[in-house]
Amino acid sequence: MSTPLRFIPEEAKRWTNKAGEPIAVVEVTIRTLLGIYLLKPTDRNRSLILGVLGRAQERIGFELYGYAYLSNHGSLLVGVRDSVELARLMEYIHGNIARELGRKEQSNWAGRFWGRRGRPILVLTDEDLVGRMRYLLANSTKEGLVVHPARWPGAHCARALCEGRADHGVWVDRTKLRSLRAGASQKRSVAEADATTHYRVRLDKLPCWAGLSDAQYQQLIREMCHDIRQQAALERKNTQRTVLGRKRLLRMSPHHRPDQVDRSPAPAVHCIDQAFRQWFIEAYRSFVAGYRAACKRLCVLVHQCDIPPGGVPPFATVAAHPL
């Protein structure tokens, strides 16, 4: 199945950001190639992921409600103004995480990092917002990896939200680092810290809970995490399973490939309102039809240009294999 097109209709912008601009809330998920543990939750990987998130926030300006990166997949809950902003943040975050964590000193992975492009799924109601936040927080605990969401050693928003503080990460400017090392004398060594910037990851309140005080919001998240912990403990008791734990997690190779990877299909949209859900599905189908027609018209215009022979004209593959 091909990756769905990014589509955010005006009707999906049901909330506003701090500037009063209409926004849509999107859950973004992504998985490593073959489910390999390239996102191993070391302190260094955690810091690098948080640095990418913090820098992306500063450059793009989207709202971030939650994040959770396990050993082989990551999830974000974000508020965006349109599809262009969504595309920018996905490209920036996923591209830079792959470049940093694929380096020799992290996972020594030179090939393709992600199994597919990130999957954005719109969230359309307040109830769905709370449900997706709970699901994101449960990552790591529901899999039996740790006993509480805040115990996950990797990049996870639970601890920051429960303790009412912000996470911080680092961004290494590789271009600056190479330049410094190229111009350094033999007597002076250049450290990575000379090209490192620290970033704060700002977490926003869910739009449906934006009117709560900081203390009230923190208490709701704590209660949610406590409930997740109790539910996971009951599940372990019924199945006689044990928690994997931090030490065993960190002993695993970043090249470890699990025996099974969840292949369940992603929903088209998160919406408990069946009428609204059906409206969105029909609107998406109409959008795809219009998008395909526009691509065909653009292809015709491109082929009318005087393109030198010997290469592949832009949109030639679209004409041969329509979306």
What annotation goes with each model-predicted range?
Residues 1-323:
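Short catalytic/metal-binding and nucleic-acid-binding patches
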